[in-house]
Amino acid sequence: KVVVRIAEWAPGSKSPVGELVERLGMAGNNDTEMHSILAEYELPYRFEPEIEEAAQAIDARVTAKEIAQRRDFRGVTTFTVDPADAKDFDDALSVRKIKDGVWEVGVHIADVTHYVRPHSVIDDEAVERGTSVYLVDRTVPMLPERLSNELCSLRPHETSLCFSAVFTLNENLDILEEWFGRTVIHSDRLSLIHISEPT
């Protein structure tokens, strides 16, 4: 299978003139068929070298100054829930009891804005892609793997920077208070299989 581009189609001609863009591989091969699906729907399955280089150049350090500017949830029970084979953990939940009948629930999303500046090459590419695409056997990420699987992945027992929505609830699940802002967390990992097992 190949990807071709129509280069010219003369008026009155039954057939266009095309040019070879890329060889995908032998029909029937799993990688070939997956790449064929992505090509058919114009979904990019690799990043340009300049984007990968920009991702590698990002400073991974989380400084004490940065942590001091955030609400600290590192001592609160926090966990991700994803498939067992997941590599990108981009959201987590936290739960703690405030007092009898009152609970705090936090929804934590990886704070990509800490690492990706507006209108940078990575930001522009993410805007172009719009979302990560999940196929049966692979993920086509919105961000380079350096970000999606490392810097912006809420990996277990690591300091992670997040943007969070935090709600205080009563036993009837009425929202008593709400807060939105930047946080820092330590999360544990649960899998979908783990939480589905009977106790």
Where are these regions (language model features)?
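Charge-lined substrate channels and their catalytic hotspots, especially those that engage the 3′ end
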Residues: 1-106, 113-158, 190
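Short beta-strand segments
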Residues: 16, 108-110, 168, 176-178
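Short acidic-glycine loop/turn motifs at beta-strand connectors
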Residues: 97-99, 169-174
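Short, solvent-exposed aromatic-acidic interface loops
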Residues: 180-189
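Residue-level detector of conserved catalytic or cofactor/ligand-binding positions
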Residues: 191-199
